[in-house]
């Protein structure tokens, strides 16, 4: 089946789209990417999304106009990726602007902006969307959703495999080996903490939005990190909490950046960005170290995906702190960096049609595995 997958992450960079074909066993499908596109949001739309997600005041009219603009942008991206309209369905994540994990007796909640009926009409095909709500309703974290999909797309090897997504938030998937005592272990995954979100916000704030991210890590490269601050931050409650766990800009956003800026003993932009970059790498390394201490699991391979994989400073710092693992870009196994997440949501849409559960207790803490997503048709 031909399926479109569309994704925009917490960094609000734009929309990545793939046109893929899936056949065979849904647990280990045969798949190929026919086409892929990436479209950056125009600066005014990107800033509106960030402002809304940071809690800035929006009228009802402004919210409707924002949701229409996002939906129309998704439609443009879909038509660009599939100009002949061969896809039968589209799996569309929508634009995340709020994510609240469950806490105690309070269930979690997540908001992805998308007018799915409008999108279905604009692209004239069935749209599967709202993938997180059912997991949350069943007591899960609602994120991350990609670990089961990573396992299906990438498969197992002789040891544990890890896939690290460096979006606004860093999340990790762990795929058990194909043989040995861990063969029957479940796929694991969780949100580690900030990857790009604090770095991007710092760059935007310090450059008055002339820059939106640290291109090629050049700002961080020329800075001196505050390791005392990093060590202090790594002891915060979220980083000590075991999985399942999820997070977002609500926890690691502008207010969090401002708090951290008061705790750094260096005031220059390059030192701030360097500190935040190494902090992101340390968060990931600490989680993998804790995984080994608690479960005796140490991946032999770590594939890195997402926009942060294109930051050579962040990539290098992760490599330095993950010794004993073969650390490489996910592009080396045939999945382009920007295609990995839209490919997983294309697969999740296919799974929805097949009535195959896309969530797992071992990953999100959901009470039972569930088929994810909601269908809307163009007619």
Curated annotation (Swiss-Prot):
Task: State whether keyword Cytoplasm applies.
Answer: no
Superkingdom assignment:
Bacteria
- Which key words are in the record? ATP-binding, Carbohydrate metabolism, Kinase, Nucleotide-binding, Transferase
- InterPro entries with a match to the protein in the record: Anhydro_N_Ac-Mur_kinase, ATPase_NBD
The top EC class is transferase
Q: Which reaction does it catalyse?
A: 1,6-anhydro-N-acetyl-beta-muramate + ATP + H2O = N-acetyl-D-muramate 6-phosphate + ADP + H(+)
Q: Which residues bind ATP?
A: 9-16
- Gene3D superfamilies documented for this protein: 3.30.420.40
Give the function comment from the record. Catalyzes the specific phosphorylation of 1,6-anhydro-N-acetylmuramic acid (anhMurNAc) with the simultaneous cleavage of the 1,6-anhydro ring, generating MurNAc-6-P. Is required for the utilization of anhMurNAc either imported from the medium or derived from its own cell wall murein, and thus plays a role in cell wall recycling.
What family is this protein classified in? Belongs to the anhydro-N-acetylmuramic acid kinase family.
- What is this protein identified as? Anhydro-N-acetylmuramic acid kinase
Organism field:
Prochlorococcus marinus (strain MIT 9211)
What would be the name of the gene that encodes this protein? anmK
